[in-house]
């Protein structure tokens, strides 16, 4: 059923550029204040709207792993309302906890934080004056896209390779063991400062435990005493999802919904998909393997068909036994994003001229496990000197080697790029070049892909943990 009116909570949408966030509360939308952007209760569902400029909108509905079926349903309905009020042209995205898209993560520069419970959990906010406060332990994991997930406040939750935040209300401890990464430390400090200064309005004090990581009596009192440090294990390597499914072919499917039960028929396969396969009278699903699932809606489709796009995408996941967290994005005929058009060899947009947006990936080799992470809306500051980065400019691949990358990463940098190119499915020139570039020696051909460039950024350790500590807390 189509909504008969627009929710009053949506009155401000489309009026200015920036981010708006709503949380589902008893079948209604509750605006999330800017000070709480990036905090997500895992028992709830949220809607996030980003306006880059008038006419360019991305609407995401985010699902916590414990969100109820009712909350998920309300989020879907409200997403349709937003779509209607903005003329039916936003790009829609379905986001699942722990598997958010790089675009979604790019909105929250200090990373995101998952909080246990849901709307009815009785979570203590600032106005509770810290009464009956229970300790919260957050595990900060990831390279550029850091996620802070609430875990059990016990010694078994700690490991020596990651950063943890112990939130005691009036006191916040950042635990940074020696094996934790530079970026995780910097992001952990930024997140803790945000909690203290913004969420708590200066009512909390931040304690940084780096040199004192194994002997601070107050911190360890919550984990059985200082002697418990011997029980802490090394970091557990998580299997990386980036390389999965890459042996499969990209496929294009036509959607038929005549009987009310959507069916899909394959109309194209491989790396030579052509734009002419799309028909404005119909809807199509593009399975771009690790690029996600796109539901393309022809301009002659009905409003009802537009509203079903993400449902069709979810049904496709079920029919093809794909993980529930697979990215699903709705795109509209004549308003396609480059993330969609890049998969078609002959797609040329005369308005945009260039139909490919460069992609930046962070590559790290932790304990022999290759980890690849895409960074959306990237800037020069996203180049991390601790790792190897891959900049994909379609017909040119740049391997940027950070000065502090480990020896194996440096040695395997070129092979990593070759592996990336061999397994990638984008239609590109057969003679695509691979160039290796070292930190501090970037040529103009590389710098041009960044919004701005400052040669001084990589000098004098301006982005070291110690320097960031001084900037944040002094």
Curated annotation (Swiss-Prot):
GO terms for molecular function: actin filament binding; actin monomer binding; phosphatidylinositol-4,5-bisphosphate binding. Residues 239-474 are annotated as: F- and G-actin binding, Ca-independent. GO terms for biological process: actin filament depolymerization; actin filament severing; actin polymerization or depolymerization; barbed-end actin filament capping; positive regulation of synapse pruning. Residues 70-73 are annotated as: Actin-actin interfilament contact point. Gene3D superfamilies: Severin (3.40.20.10). Gelsolin-like repeats lie at residues 27-105, 147-202, 272-337, 374-446. It holds the Pfam family Gelsolin. Residues 106-147 are annotated as: Required for synapse elimination during development. CDD domains: gelsolin_S1_like (cd11290), gelsolin_S2_like (cd11289), gelsolin_S3_like (cd11292), gelsolin_S6_like (cd11291). The record marks 387-388 as: Cleavage. It is found in: Cytoplasm, Cytoskeleton. Keywords: Actin capping, Actin-binding, Calcium, Cytoplasm, Cytoskeleton, Repeat. Residues 133-226 are annotated as: Required for phosphatidylinositol 4,5-bisphosphate binding and regulation. InterPro entries: ADF-H/Gelsolin-like_dom_sf, Gelsolin-like_dom, Villin/Gelsolin. Signal peptide: none annotated. Residues 1-131 are annotated as: Actin binding, actin severing, Ca-sensitive. Residues 247-347 are annotated as: Inhibitory for phosphatidylinositol 4,5-bisphosphate binding activity. GO terms for cellular component: actin cytoskeleton; cytoplasm. Residues 1-238 are annotated as: Necessary for barbed end capping activity. Its main location: cytoplasm. Calcium-regulated, actin-modulating protein that binds to the plus (or barbed) ends of actin monomers or filaments, preventing monomer exchange (end-blocking or capping). Binds actin but does not nucleate actin polymerization, albeit slows down elongation by blocking the barbed ends. By promoting actin depolymerization, required for the elimination of presynaptic components downstream of the egl-1, ced-4 and ced-3 apoptotic pathway during larval development. PANTHER family: GELSOLIN (PTHR11977:SF123), VILLIN (PTHR11977). Belongs to the villin/gelsolin family. Monomer. Binds to actin monomers and filaments. This is Gelsolin-like protein 1. The gene is gsnl-1.
């Amino acid at each position: 059923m189509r909504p008969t009116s627009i929710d009053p909570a949506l009155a401000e949408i489309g009026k200015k550029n920036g981010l708006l966030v709503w949380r589902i509360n008893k079948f209604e939308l509750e605006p999330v204040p800017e000070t709480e952007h990036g905090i997500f209760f895992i028992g709830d569902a949220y809607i996030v709207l980003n306006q880059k400029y008038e006419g360019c909108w991305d609407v995401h509905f985010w699902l916590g792993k414990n969100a109820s079926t009712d909350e998920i349903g309300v989020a879907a309905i409200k997403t349709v309302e937003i779509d209607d009020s903005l003329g039916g042209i936003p790009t829609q995205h379905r986001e699942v906890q722990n598997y958010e898209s790089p675009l979604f993560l790019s909105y929250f520069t200090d990373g995101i934080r998952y909080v246990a419970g849901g709307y009815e959990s009785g979570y203590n906010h600032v106005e509770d004056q810290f009464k009956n406060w229970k300790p919260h332990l957050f595990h900060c994991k990831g390279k550029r896209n850091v996620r802070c997930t609430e875990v059990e406040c016990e010694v078994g939750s700690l490991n020596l390779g990651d950063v943890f935040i112990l939130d005691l209300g009036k006191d916040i401890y950042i635990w940074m063991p020696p094996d934790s990464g530079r970026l995780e430390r910097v992001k952990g400090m930024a997140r803790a400062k945000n909690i203290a200064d913004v969420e708590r309005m200066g009512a909390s004090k931040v304690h940084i435990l780096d040199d004192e990581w194994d002997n601070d009596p107050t911190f360890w009192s919550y984990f059985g005493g200082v002697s418990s440090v011997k029980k802490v294990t090394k970091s557990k390597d998580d299997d990386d999802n980036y390389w999965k499914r890459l042996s499969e072919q990209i496929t294009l499917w036509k959607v038929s919904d005549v009987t009310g039960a959507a069916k899909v028929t394959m109309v194209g396969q491989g790396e030579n998909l052509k734009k002419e396969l799309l028909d404005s009278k119909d809807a199509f699903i593009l399975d771009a393997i690790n690029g996600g699932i796109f539901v393309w809606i022809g301009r002659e489709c009905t409003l009802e068909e537009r509203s079903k796009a993400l449902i069709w995408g979810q049904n496709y996941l079920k029919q093809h036994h794909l993980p529930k967290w697979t990215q699903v994005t709705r795109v509209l005929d004549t308003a396609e994003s480059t993330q969609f058009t890049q998969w078609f060899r002959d797609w040329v947009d005369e308005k945009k001229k260039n139909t490919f947006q460069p992609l930046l990936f962070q590559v790290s080799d932790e304990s022999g496990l290759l980890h690849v992470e895409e960074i959306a809306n990237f800037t020069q500051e996203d180049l991390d000197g601790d790792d190897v980065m891959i900049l994909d400019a379609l017909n040119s691949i740049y391997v940027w080697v950070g000065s502090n990358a480990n020896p194996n990463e440096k040695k395997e940098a070129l092979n990593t790029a070759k592996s990336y190119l061999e397994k990638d499915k984008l239609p590109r020139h057969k003679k695509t070049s691979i160039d290796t570039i070292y930190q501090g020696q970037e040529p103009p051909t590389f710098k041009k892909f960044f919004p701005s460039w400052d040669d001084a950024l990589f000098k004098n350790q301006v982005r070291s943990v110690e320097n960031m500590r001084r900037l944040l807390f002094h």
